[in-house]
Amino acid sequence: MFSFKVSRWMGLACFRSLVTSSPSIRQKKLMHKLQEEKAFREEMKIFREKIEDFREEMWTFRGKIRAFRGQILGFWEEERPFWEEEKSFWKEEKSFWEMEKSFREEEKTFWKKYRIFWKDDKAFWKEDNALWEKDRNLLQEDKALWEEEKALWVEERALLEEEKALWEDKTSLWEEENALWEEERAFWVESNGHIAREQMLEELHNANRGRRSLAFSRGRA
C-alpha cells in the first residue's frame, strides 16, 4: 500500500511540471494538495518510525514474555512438590475436621454422662453423710451401753465376791455344826443312852444334813 502511494506522488510531481501554464486557481489547489501530501508524508514517516519503535517494543516485550514463561515453568517445576504436599495437607485437614466433628459428638455425650454422674454422686454423698450421722449416733449409744455394761460387770463382780464370802461363812458354819453334832453324838454314846434315843438322834442328824445339802445347792444357784 505504501509503495502504491509513493508511485502516485511521483506521478503527481511529473504532472505538476506539465501544467505550469494552467490557470492560477487550479495551480493554487494543486499547491495546497501538494502541501497536504507533503505534510502527510511527514506524518507517515513519523508514524513509520513509531511502527518501528513499537515493533522493537513488541519484540522486547515478547522476550520478557518468554522469560516470564520460563520463570513460570521453572517455578512450577520447583513448586510442584509443594502443591502435592498442599493437596495432601488439605486431605489431612478434611480428615481432621471429620475427626473433630466426631470428637465433639463424643464430648457432648461425655458431658451429658458427667452431669448425670455428678448428680448421682451428690445424692450418694448426701445419703452417705446421713448414714454417717446415724452411725455416729449409734456409736455413741453403743459407747453408753458399753459403759453401762462395764458398770454392771463391776457390780456383778462385787456381788460374786460377796457371794463367795457368804459361801465361806456358810461352810464355816456347817463345819461348826457338824462338830457340834459329833460332840453330841459322842456324849450320848458315852452315856450309854437308849438305842431309840440314838436312832432318833441319828435321824435328826440325817435330817439336818439334808437341810445343809439343800442350802448348799441353793447357794450355788
Swiss-Prot record:
<protein>
    <recommendedName>
        <fullName>Coiled-coil domain-containing protein 70</fullName>
    </recommendedName>
</protein>
<keyword id="KW-0175">Coiled coil</keyword>
<keyword id="KW-0809">Transit peptide</keyword>
<feature type="coiled-coil region">
    <location>
        <begin position="129"/>
        <end position="168"/>
    </location>
</feature>
<dbReference type="GO" id="GO:0005886">
    <property type="term" value="C:plasma membrane"/>
</dbReference>
